[in-house]
A protein has these predicted regions:
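Catalytic phosphate/metal-binding cores of nucleic-acid and nucleotide-processing enzymes, i.e., regions
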Residues: 1-143
Length: 143
């Protein structure tokens, strides 16, 4: 199994961000890069950063099943369950730099709902650099 170094992972992510040819799943690729970077950078926090499988197209039957199980539309893509001096968790919505990559109304509702509690930090990250900056800032002085 090939274990990627941070430098190699970062170089690959930068190269993908600079491609002119559109990717079929740019938000997916961005999220994969971010999760891989986090795993390499913070191995002691393994299992604390996880994805919420809210995206994708589903049949009406599958959507109804998921809703019955408690799935809530608009929940952020990633959740970091680690408190810092101010918040109980970091909620991360992944978007790309594309002009049409915007939060849906349900995502905006979720953001307003959780931030109004004052207990959680919610951020939107459009690049690996955004993600790295937000995570480092959030975890600053607590590890």
């Amino acid at each position: 199994m090939d274990v990627k170094t941070f430098d190699k992972l970062f170089a690959e992510a930068q190269a993908r961000n600079q491609q002119r040819k559109p990717r079929t799943e740019p938000e997916h690729n961005l999220q994969v890069d971010c999760v891989q970077w986090f795993s390499l950078q913070y191995p002691s926090l393994r299992g604390r950063l996880f994805a919420v499988p809210n995206g994708g197209h589903r049949s009406k039957t599958e959507a109804a099943r998921l809703k019955a199980e408690g799935v809530i539309a608009g929940v952020s893509d990633l959740i970091l369950l680690k408190s810092n001096h101010q918040y109980g968790a970091l909620l991360i919505e992944m978007k790309t730099t594309a002009r049409n990559s915007r939060q849906s109304d349900k995502q905006k509702w979720w953001q307003q709902t959780v931030t109004s509690l004052g207990e959680y930090k919610y951020v939107v990250c459009r690049t690996l650099d955004d993600f790295m900056r937000e995570v480092r800032c959030y975890l600053q002085n607590i590890l």
